[in-house]
Design a protein with these regions (language model features):
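Class I SAM-dependent methyltransferase Rossmann-like catalytic core
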Residues: 2-57
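Class I SAM-dependent methyltransferase SAM/SAH-binding core
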Residues: 57-115, 123
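Helix-to-beta-strand junctions that scaffold the AdoMet/dcAdoMet cofactor pocket
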Residues: 79, 133-134, 149-151
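A short SAM/SAH-binding and catalytic strip from SAM-dependent methyltransferases
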Residues: 121-139
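A short glycine-rich, Lys/Arg-flanked "PGG" loop and its adjoining helix->strand segment in the class I
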Residues: 139-154
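Conserved catalytic/acceptor-binding region of the Class I
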Residues: 150, 154-237, 247
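C-terminal lobe and adjacent flexible extensions of AdoMet/dcAdoMet transferase-like proteins
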Residues: 204-207, 214-289
Length: 289
């Protein structure tokens, strides 16, 4: 399993001024890839917005793309000629020698995007990234993403759904610690995002707003093909929570509980299994009048 010394926060202040909650190294990109595999196994549908990527001719942005694993899998599933763009603040994650229809660029969601990108994407996709806004106003980051969508195009946002999780005592402790961590580093902006985002999308004038909630099984509740990956993913995330909270003010979970959490978490999820939820939220920019 992962070693605690390999997962560290790169933030210099503890308030996520650099838009990174956990580390920026191979361990972290591996964790992100495992997270993708767990979510995709439970929910193999890439796009909920009514876009048929198999028709081709679309331009898609995946912001906070990490290794580009979502792009690679969505591109393969589409099986047609589209244009794919992945952005992240950690360029070392990007794949080498991507196909001609795929490009990767450095870009922070808290900074201005290239002016020439505005209004050019049929789909802007962001997954498990918005808590990384830190103390930058969440609404500003979301407005910048919306500005990239072309008239008639779509934005799709995927984040944690913090309620109605089916976990044991250690799982409940882990969930509380993670929520406290995200709350601390984002000034309260990075949790309960569905409730925050829907009014923002409406205020921005977007239409056809809809969402769905997906349940992802872990450990003993997961299928044999993905079980080991779900366990490793949770362990790596728990290590990240345990290590990153060392540089933050105290949270509602004690230091002793945080230090013991990864190993206890692994034992519980192997024996009993857990279920966590995330939401997929999509909305359309109206056609120009």
């Amino acid at each position: 399993m992962a070693n605690a010394s390999t997962i560290t926060s790169v933030s210099q202040t503890g308030i996520n001024d650099d838009n990174v909650i956990f580390g920026a190294d191979k361990t972290e990109v591996d964790r992100l890839d495992m997270q993708h595999k767990c979510l995709h196994d439970a929910n193999p549908k890439f796009v909920y917005a009514p876009l048929d990527l198999s028709k081709g001719g679309y331009k898609i942005l995946d912001q906070a793309t990490g290794s580009g694993i979502w792009i690679r899998d969505a591109r393969k599933a589409a099986g047609a000629q589209n244009t794919w763009v992945g952005t992240d603040i950690e360029e070392s994650y990007f794949p080498t020698n991507p196909p001609a229809d795929t490009t990767y660029k450095y870009q922070s969601m808290t900074e201005a995007w290239p002016k020439e990108w505005e209004g050019t994407f049929d789909l802007v996709h962001s997954r498990m990234a918005l808590p990384g806004v830190g103390l930058t106003p969440l609404e500003d980051a979301v407005k910048r993403l919306i500005a990239l969508v072309k008239p008639g195009g779509w934005i799709q946002l995927v984040e944690m759904e913090w309620g109605n999780c089916n976990v044991g005592p250690v799982g409940a402790l882990f969930q509380r610690a993670a929520k406290d961590l995200f709350t601390t580093v984002s000034g309260g902006q990075g949790v309960d995002l569905r409730e925050k985002l829907i009014p923002m999308l409406k205020e921005a004038g977007l239409e056809n707003i809809d969402f769905t909630i997906i349940t992802t099984p872990f450990g003993a509740r997961a299928s044999d093909r993905i079980r080991a990956t779900t366990e490793a993913s949770l362990f790596a995330t728990a290590m990240g929570v345990s290590t990153t909270t060392k540089m933050l003010p105290p949270i509602s979970v004690t230091r002793e509980q945080l230090d013991e959490m990864p190993e206890k978490l692994l034992a519980e999820v192997k024996k009993e299994g857990w279920e966590f939820q995330h939401f997929v939220l999509w909305a359309q920019k109206p056609l120009s009048k």
